[in-house]
């Protein structure tokens, strides 16, 4: 059913057997009985709005829009594009939505892992605007996700992942962001596909530009050890922790050697 207003969409979604339709890339693989499918395509949620202070990404924006947006690239380099580049193919990314990727809170989500490390909020119809880090751990309900909001700030951002094949789900995914927060150098680490959903860790570290690689490795080891990992068909918990340590080291080294955004 094509909703005419957000209020109508929210009311329809309260029914037990109703589902909000995103890109249908994940929903179509399920076997749940769905009585009402709610289409949000006429509610203006398919644009990325940029202001002086934020990027506001509509829930119905596609991953391809996220990948190609020039403003996001100028602010965060290639990090945003990198987090979606390996997701199946261009045709898939032209249909899969950002809202579906975030609302699902999937363990394998590259998009969730990347955005969690940034200064990101979600806008809910009933729940208002809350931090993405809070939303990730919130119990799933029947609220509507309207947009994802990224606050602009001078931050350095890196994203990387390990996959068994190019377009497969990640074995591990890591995002590293650093910037000045209240005058203190802060580092944010997000690790996803553990295989649990992404989790966030914050450290207030003032790291000198002339730090040695061995010292960076020690920082990366500390960070990787503070996340919980699990075992599945793609890898063991120990293997994932090792990969996370390697990726975090590479991302931290890249940020430090190439210069931090605010310096």
PLM regions with names:
Residues 1-263:
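C-terminal structural segment of proteins
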């Amino acid at each position: 059913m094509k909703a005419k207003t957000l209020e109508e969409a929210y009311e329809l979604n309260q029914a037990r057997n109703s589902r909000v339709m995103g890109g249908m890339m994940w929903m179509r693989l399920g076997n749940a009985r769905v009585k009402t499918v709610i289409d949000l395509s006429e509610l203006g949620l398919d644009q990325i709005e940029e202001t002086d202070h934020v990027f506001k990404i509509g829930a119905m924006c596609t991953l391809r829009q996220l990948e190609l947006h020039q403003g996001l690239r100028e602010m965060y380099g290639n990090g945003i594009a990198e987090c979606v580049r390996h997701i199946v193919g261009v045709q898939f990314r032209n249909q899969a939505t950002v809202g579906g990727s975030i609302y699902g809170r999937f363990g394998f989500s590259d998009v969730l892992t990347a955005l969690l490390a940034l200064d990101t909020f979600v806008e809910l119809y009933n729940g208002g605007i809350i931090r993405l880090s809070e939303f990730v751990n919130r119990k799933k309900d029947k609220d509507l996700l309207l947009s994802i909001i990224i606050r602009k700030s001078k931050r350095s951002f890196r994203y990387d992942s390990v996959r068994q094949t190019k377009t497969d789900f990640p074995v591990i995914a890591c995002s590293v962001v650093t910037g000045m927060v209240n005058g203190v150098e802060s580092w944010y680490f997000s690790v996803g596909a553990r295989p649990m959903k992404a989790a966030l860790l914050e450290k207030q570290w003032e790291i000198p530009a002339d730090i040695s690689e061995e010292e960076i490795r020690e920082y990366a080891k500390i960070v990787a050890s503070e996340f919980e990992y699990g075992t599945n068909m793609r890898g063991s918990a120990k293997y994932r922790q090792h990969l996370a340590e390697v990726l975090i080291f590479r991302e931290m080294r890249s940020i430090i050697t190439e210069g931090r955004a605010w310096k």
